[in-house]
Amino acid sequence: MVCPFCLHKKTSVYNSRKTAKLNATWRRRRCEACGREFTTRESADTESILRVGTTKRTVPYSRAKLTISILSVSDHRADHGEAAYWLADTIEQKLYRHAAGANNTVTKHSIMNEVLEALKRFDTAAYVKYLTRYSPNLDARTLKKHLK
């Protein structure tokens, strides 16, 4: 790891932990040249996951799109920015597990199901908004079934 202060290439880790909420590792490092300390957070690279669309075409998975879709349905909340970030992180952890067993691919349908599952437990209003906005061919009967 390169020191962000002096750009020296040798640093040592003197404290390391798995974070409770994130799928990441927190590390406290010290530069061997200048002696300054800094913190890093290491997580898996999401660009290795591919999303299979409805037309069977694969495109890179985008955390930004996931977060924006959650933000757009939770704008009634005072903490919608922070909530969208943490929900996206929770959903992403589940998507990693899906992708691991399927050649690093996830379907659009599985992403939508994970988002709906998370929103259903977190915020009913956001769940209904997401369901009506992103579910194709949603009718009144199906909506009632989802709300039970």
Q: What are the functions of these language-model segments?
A:
Residues 3-6, 31-34:
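Short cysteine-rich clusters marking metal-coordination/redox-active sites
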Residues 3-5, 23, 42-44:
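A generic structural signal for short, solvent-exposed coil/turn residues
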Residues 7, 15:
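Short, Gly/Pro- and small/polar-rich lid/capping loops
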Residues 10-11, 38:
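Cys/His-rich microdomains that often coordinate metals
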Residues 11, 27-29:
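Polar/charged side chains located within well-ordered beta-strands of beta-rich proteins
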Residues 16-26:
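Short linker/helix segments within small regulatory modules
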Residues 32-48:
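Short metal-binding segments enriched for Cys and/or His
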Residues 43-148:
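Charged, amphipathic alpha-helical regulatory modules used
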